[in-house]
A protein has these predicted regions:
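Active-/binding-site microenvironments in catalytic and ligand-binding cores
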Residues: 1-243
Length: 243
């Protein structure tokens, strides 16, 4: 896909990091603290402390797989690539069956990222966020991996239900050497295919970490699918689980 600079629109698919960002149960709260200010000290400096699998972040295989690749070992060509966006807003939240995406699986090219759009970013910071997103089920995940995708992403907190204790879907993806992008936003602004840039922090031997995800959209491709009216979602607490 070739995009001219004069026609490109950059869509920020990452949430802000701050002390109020939603967390899985049991995760220590973040601490973003300014310890020097321009008025008092002549310069500003801050301290950031947070768990690496919070906010918009990327899972490396080492997150769930003993001996799996760490984040700094993943080729950048797998993180700066193209994405195929599956609009799942007409599908019930939860695992997406293969038959729900079968009409588009043939569009997948080797090294694409598969992104699942639920419009769930509108629920960020509410109890509904932990129940109202879509992610590929086991059969769909295997089919996408067989097509050669480099990873998967979605506008929700995990590749598995938040109360999972087996992490089956994490293990399918990470066991195949793929990456997982969690807590994305603004996927509703993306067309069916676009360029994608995933820029994680370069931390040695990281099992995952914060990531800035930018979609590069050719204006000729349109502005994405307009938001559906909000689906009714049941509020729920967020029990612990892998993210």
């Amino acid at each position: 896909m070739s995009i001219g600079v004069e026609t490109v629109r950059v869509v920020d698919c990452s949430h802000h990091y701050d002390n109020a960002m939603p967390l899985m149960e049991g995760i220590a709260p973040p601490d973003f603290t300014d310890f020097a200010t321009v008025v008092r000290d002549g310069y500003a400096m801050s301290r950031y402390a947070f768990t690496n699998h919070t906010g918009t972040h990327i899972d490396a295989p080492a997150h769930q797989i003993d001996g799996g690749a760490t984040l700094d070992e993943i080729p950048l060509s797998r993180l700066v690539t193209e994405a195929v966006v599956f609009d799942c807003r007409s599908v019930d939240p939860g695992p997406v069956a293969l038959h729900d995406i079968s009409d588009r699986v043939d569009e997948i090219r080797p090294n694409d990222l598969a992104l699942f759009c639920s419009g769930n970013d509108r629920n960020w910071g509410t109890d509904a966020y932990w129940r109202a997103w879509c992610y590929p089920g086991a059969e769909a995940s295997t089919a996408l991996i067989d097509r050669g995708v480099s990873g998967v992403g979605f506008d929700g907190p995990s590749a598995d239900p938040v109360d999972s204790v087996t992490y089956e879907l994490h293990r399918i993806w990470l066991g195949a050497g793929r990456v997982i992008l969690e807590n994305l936003r603004s996927l509703t602004e993306l067309p069916g295919r676009c360029r994608i840039v995933c820029a994680p922090l370069k931390v040695r031997k990281a099992n995952g970490g914060p990531v800035r995800v930018l979609a590069l959209v050719d204006e000729a491709e349109g502005t994405g699918v307009e938001q559906d009216p909000a689906r009714a979602t049941a509020g729920a607490s967020h029990p612990g689980g892998a993210s």
